């Protein structure tokens, strides 16, 4: 059975605030284990903008927007590639239909102007930054000191994909149908994060821009 979180835009808005836990929980746990102040752990996620020049911040924002737009244009190509050329070839069209039919939908149904504006603002302020803080800032930054960076990126992308097709909420058909799509975007966002020297700003803006474009179009 499909889970339609967007059926009531107001509920979708409220649920979105839960993503703040992606920042609070790992920071609290890390602060407890490593005996660091909570704020230090938050900054280590990539939120530290100390000594950042306005020009650099604006360049990162601009780069993030451009990358997000690029991601939007390749998103449908990626989805088509995985579904038609891989999943359908291996499991058949019926498998994909079941996978799509049981997916979690976060597309708001008939939102009014205020609801749509709030959802866009939430993408910018909460969804993008909080997901990037955990999957990139926390997972990559904490694991890269123990394993090779490539393994940190793979771990981050795997967790990112699993979060979007959670095994305890969707069937195996949905996981297999969409896993490659989300895993690929996990890799791409990780590369953005690493390329900008572990700054959350570009990957967060790219993530938010992609989500907003998918929300609108």
Feature locations, PLM:
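Transmembrane helix-loop-helix hairpins at the membrane interface
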Residues: 113-217
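Alpha-helical transmembrane segments
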Residues: 1, 8-24, 62-68, 153-159
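Hydrophobic membrane-targeting alpha-helices
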Residues: 29-33, 73-82, 161-162, 191-195
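Alpha-helical transmembrane segments of multipass membrane proteins
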Residues: 22-26, 67, 71-79, 156, ...
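Membrane-water interface of transmembrane alpha-helices
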Residues: 25-40, 82, 86
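Helix N-terminus capping/helix-initiation residues
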Residues: 8, 36-37, 171
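Juxtamembrane helix-loop-helix connectors linking adjacent transmembrane helices
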Residues: 5-11, 40-127, 145
